[in-house]
Amino acid sequence: MKKSVIIAIIVVVAACVVLFSLFGHCNKGPQVSEHRVDTIMTDNLVILIPRYDSIDFLGTNITPEADSPHDNIIYVSAASFTLKYLDTFSHSNIIGTHVCSGELHKLSGSKLLSGAFVYYNGQYKFLDKDYMSEMERAAQCGGCGFTQQLILYKGAKVKTRTKDNMNVQFRALCNLHDTTLCIVQTRGSMPFGQFKQSLLNAGITDALYLDMGAWDYGWYRDSIGTPHHIGTSRHGNYTNWLVFYK
């Protein structure tokens, strides 16, 4: 075989590898040796750090159960806002554009929505209002994404529609020290302004609100697989779940 032919074959194979990495189903992240959720407690926050292989955003009103012996979920909770209490599921009942398992749903949002989160190609990103191209990219790559109220972005507070004096329990998807994806929840009710400052004090650089109130239910697994429940509002009217998989 001529040398030029061999070189051409190598170039074609390399191009195929690059194209697959760019446009194939690439939702898997770096594989970890031990799948669990680590917990860090501060005076007023609970920081949950999933050791995961992949992430997805599921559109369904079926609550993922924590007692399945073959469950590959290590963390799950609601993420986007839900429009109405409905007994049947509809993507149109999820407020804002989202990507579920590589499927893009362009929907109208709310004035509360000021940012987004995407996960594809094994990497995550927090985004401000210019997120549509990244949503489309996540869909092309078999990834996921959702829109929500941005609380912190690149180490700075974001002006929010939610008032700083609103005093309830809060939860957010966060970027710790700009390197570690985590979920942060208050250890009880506190003013929203205090929550923002507490996130900054804990080293959070980016934070996207996660729905709470009547949609606060979720759970996570510790290092030996024991599920721990968070939130109490367990019902059949949920529309979406942020899921970390092992």
Predicted regions and their residues:
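Gly/Ser/Thr/Pro-rich low-complexity, intrinsically disordered segments
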Residues: K2-K246
